[in-house]
């Protein structure tokens, strides 16, 4: 096969891949099916090129397999999920056969394939799938920890997301030590994105979700604690809330409102923790978060935030009775 023929095949496949990705961004019920048709056609084209053509060609083949798997996983049924896992496995195996240090795109794509495989297993939820999903997330982190991954442009963000996936998974498990291991994963997610959350909204989203996991874990402990004892993780939880809401306010000042659902949850949780364990700081907590000068008028004036602040002020009233 000539290089001209390879280029022509890749050009045709690229058009199909872009079309399929556009379908996946749609909310129509049939969108994953339409996307799958595009990815299958692109895959059939790229399978015509000899596997030993080049490492980059293997990367392109794996991209087809992973996108195909993503479309199948979106369908959610048993059959498509099984097919998705098979497609993930084929793409992962293909990438593991090439020199990953040759191009930072290679380990990045492999880590994302392992992540999405883990998410598909987690969503399927059969017995043993949680263990398999955790192993897949761990494999993704192992790839990102290799020296050759150091050239990945968004490495810190990817590490944060992988640790966040582990935190979410572990927080839903009921095994001994699950909550402590979930807390550890959430803290590692925050360490990964430290100092970057005010620069990139995607990084901010990962950090805020990690704090959300920490608060959920803390809530479990608080539900078992007596009123006259302060659990060790109260300060950690309030720090997570305060830091997270400060980041939300920073993005609100720049006209980015995407974090409000997480912010409302963090605010409500923080108000309850302050009311129960540090009531002397609750009024200041409310004032800081209802200050439009440090966030935006749309944010502090939103119905959800107004209601959350009202609920928090009722906590002050009850405490002072």
Which positions does each model-derived feature cover?
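Tetratricopeptide repeat
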Residues: 35, 41-42, 68, 84, ...
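Short coil/turn connectors between adjacent alpha-helices in alpha-solenoid helical repeat scaffolds
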Residues: 20-37, 70-86, 119-135, 151, ...
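Residues within HEAT/ARM-like alpha-solenoid scaffolds
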Residues: 7, 11, 30, 34-37, ...
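Flexible inter-repeat linkers and adjacent short helices
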Residues: 1-49, 53, 58-59, 63-70, ...
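Terminal, low-structured helical/coil segments at or just beyond the last alpha-helical repeat
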Residues: 281-284, 288-321
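Conserved alpha-helical positions within TPR/SEL1-like repeat arrays
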Residues: 10-28, 56-74, 105-123, 157-171, ...
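Eukaryotic tandem repeat interaction scaffolds
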Residues: 156-172, 180-253, 259
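Flexible helix-coil transition and linker loops at the boundaries of alpha-helical arrays
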Residues: 1-9, 46-59, 77, 93-108, ...
